[in-house]
Design a protein with these regions (language model features):
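Intrinsically disordered, low-complexity regions enriched in proline, serine, glycine
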Residues: 17-21, 48-58, 73-76, 96-99, ...
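Acidic, Ser/Thr-rich intrinsically disordered and amphipathic helical segments
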Residues: 5, 11, 35-42, 82-85, ...
Length: 323
């Protein structure tokens, strides 16, 4: 299986500085950003440990910060320690000072002082800084064409050499945390570089949000908007997950994201396999799941990434081999 270049794209908007409503890691009070940082460190540590016989980490990681734009905090590296340092350097922006307008629960304006994030900027950054490898056969064909089409034995050797090289899959893992404004999402197929349809690129998202019942919160609309960015290449599948303030849900979601995109099931199928009997609407649409649990503090649904599964992260989850 090909290695992965995992681009960790972390929202540092003001909402990420809000208090985590439940107990954080270790049972202590924490902020949303600190909980996310702990979860990402665990993800990187476990992902890097899946090939213990190798002399170095099979996978590489990069860290991006998302505010009004995109900042590359750490370029791709297999040095896990430097990835941890980059994750720990992430600091959420401070919320704007309260105005005289009505204030929603949590002490923020009705829109939370948020700026809608433009996902086109993120896709442009990834296409420029972390582009997935081109099809090796197409590059060999182009060289043969430019040399007049005389391939012969050398041309055949080039094809064998190109196809034997193991090229990484590029996966963007987006941690998004804005509950009051819908992001700007490019229409399907409209991104100029065709990244979402590239067979070596995958986009996953873990959405952190406030309680759906809080004033001004539109987390259902936000989640549905993000979920339109389904990647269609390579036979793999994007995962779009969510978490309110439920640490068990977060742990299970992070475990699901460990699996290689080429190996994992469709999202609903995966969570159906690990859900508790009678847990409900794992296969529902995001909006339907929100309606089913509109006042839940834990998230948008009762079943997605929950359902009594272990909060540990084993070497395999739901029958998947983690590499």
């Amino acid at each position: 299986m090909s290695p992965e270049d995992v681009v960790l794209c972390v929202d540092i908007g003001p909402e990420m500085s809000s208090e985590w409503a439940g107990a954080g890691p270790g049972g202590t009070a924490s902020t949303r950003m600190r909980v996310v940082q702990a979860a990402l460190r665990g993800f990187v540590r476990r992902k890097a440990s899946f090939n213990p016989k190798a002399s170095r980490c099979l996978h590489r990681f990069a860290v991006l910060a998302l505010d009004d734009g995109v900042t590359v905090v750490r370029p791709l590296t297999s040095d896990v320690r430097s990835v941890f340092e980059a994750i720990d350097r992430l600091q959420p922006l401070q919320p704007p000072e309260a105005s005289s307008s009505p204030v929603a629960e949590g002490g923020e304006d009705s829109d939370g002082g948020e700026t809608p994030f433009d996902f086109s900027e993120l896709l442009d950054c990834i296409a420029e800084r972390f582009p997935p490898a081109k099809d090796p056969l197409s590059s060999v064909t182009e060289r043969n064409r430019s040399s007049g089409g005389s391939g012969g034995v050398r041309g055949a050797e080039a094809v064998v050499g190109a196809t034997s090289q193991v090229r990484p899959v590029v996966r963007a893992l987006v941690i998004y945390g804005r509950s009051f404004t819908c992001p700007v999402v490019p229409p399907t197929g409209a991104e100029k570089h065709g990244l979402l349809s590239h067979w070596r690129f995958f986009l996953d998202c873990l959405y952190f949000h406030r309680k759906p019942s809080d004033e001004g919160v539109i987390c259902g609309e936000v989640f549905d908007s993000i979920a339109t960015m389904e990647t269609s290449g390579g036979g793999g599948h994007s995962y779009f997950l969510e978490c309110g303030h439920n640490l068990q849900r977060l742990n299970v979601n992070m475990a699901a994201l460990l699996a290689h995109p080429y190996q994992r099931d469709y999202q609903d199928t995966f969570f159906d396999k690990i859900a508790a009997p009678g847990s409900g609407a794992a296969g529902a649409t995001p909006a339907a799941r929100l309606d089913n649990n509109a006042n839940a503090a834990g998230g948008l649904s009762n079943s997605t990434a929950n359902g009594g599964a272990s909060s540990g992260v084993p070497g395999s989850v739901g029958g998947l081999t983690m590499i």
